[in-house]
C-alpha cells in the first residue's frame, strides 16, 4: 500500500499487512482501514480526518506527531502503540486493547475511551480537555503530570495507577474505587 501520496481521500484498505515502512506528511480523509495488521510502521506528521480503523492490529505502531480529527478505532489491538506528541480531536476508541500504549504529551480534545483495556498505558504530561473514560480497565496505568480534574473514572476498573497527588485532585470516582487512590495520598489504613 502506498500512502506516500500527499492526500488520500475516501479510500478503503482491507485484509492487508503493512511492514517496515515510514509514511510522512500524508493526509487521510474519510478512509477506512479494515482488518489491517502492521509491523514496524511509522506515521510522521500525518493527518487523519473522519477515518475509521476497524479490527486492526496496530501493535507497536508509531504515530509521531500526528493529528487525529473525528477518527474512530473500533476493536483494535494497540499493544505498545506510540501516539506520543499527537493531537486528538473528537476521537473515539471502542473496545480497544491498549496495553503499554503511549499517549504521552498528547493533546486530547473530546476523546472517548469506551470499554478499552488501558493497563500499563502511559498518559504522561497529557492534556485531557473533555476526555472521557467509560468502563475501561486501568491496571498500573500512568497519569503522571496529566491532571484528572473533573475526569469521571467511576465506571472503570482501577488498580495501582501511577500519578502524583496533584494529578488526581478533583478526579470523579465511586466509593468502591477510593482504595485504589489511597496509596497516592500517602495514607495508611490500619488493618483489623
Regions found by a protein language model. Give the residues of each.
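Tandem repeat scaffolds
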Residues: 1-192
Amino acid at each position: 500500500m502506498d500512502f506516500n501520496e500527499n492526500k488520500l481521500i475516501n479510500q478503503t484498505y482491507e485484509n492487508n499487512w503493512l511492514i517496515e515502512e515510514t509514511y510522512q506528511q500524508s493526509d487521510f480523509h474519510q478512509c477506512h482501514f479494515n482488518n489491517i495488521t502492521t509491523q514496524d510502521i511509522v506515521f510522521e506528521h500525518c493527518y487523519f480526518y473522519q477515518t475509521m480503523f476497524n479490527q486492526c492490529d496496530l501493535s507497536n505502531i508509531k504515530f509521531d506527531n500526528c493529528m487525529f480529527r473525528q477518527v474512530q478505532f473500533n476493536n483494535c489491538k494497540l499493544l505498545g502503540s506510540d501516539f506520543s506528541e499527537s493531537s486528538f480531536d473528537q476521537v473515539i476508541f471502542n473496545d480497544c486493547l491498549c496495553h503499554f500504549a503511549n499517549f504521552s504529551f498528547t493533546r486530547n480534545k473530546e476523546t472517548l475511551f469506551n470499554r478499552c483495556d488501558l493497563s500499563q498505558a502511559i498518559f504522561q504530561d497529557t492534556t485531557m480537555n473533555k476526555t472521557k473514560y467509560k468502563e475501561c480497565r486501568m491496571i498500573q496505568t500512568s497519569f503522571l503530570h496529566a491532571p484528572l480534574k473533573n475526569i469521571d473514572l467511576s465506571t472503570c476498573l482501577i488498580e495501582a495507577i501511577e500519578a502524583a497527588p496533584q494529578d488526581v485532585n478533583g478526579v470523579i470516582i465511586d466509593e468502591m474505587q477510593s482504595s485504589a487512590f489511597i496509596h497516592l495520598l500517602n495514607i495508611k489504613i490500619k488493618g483489623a
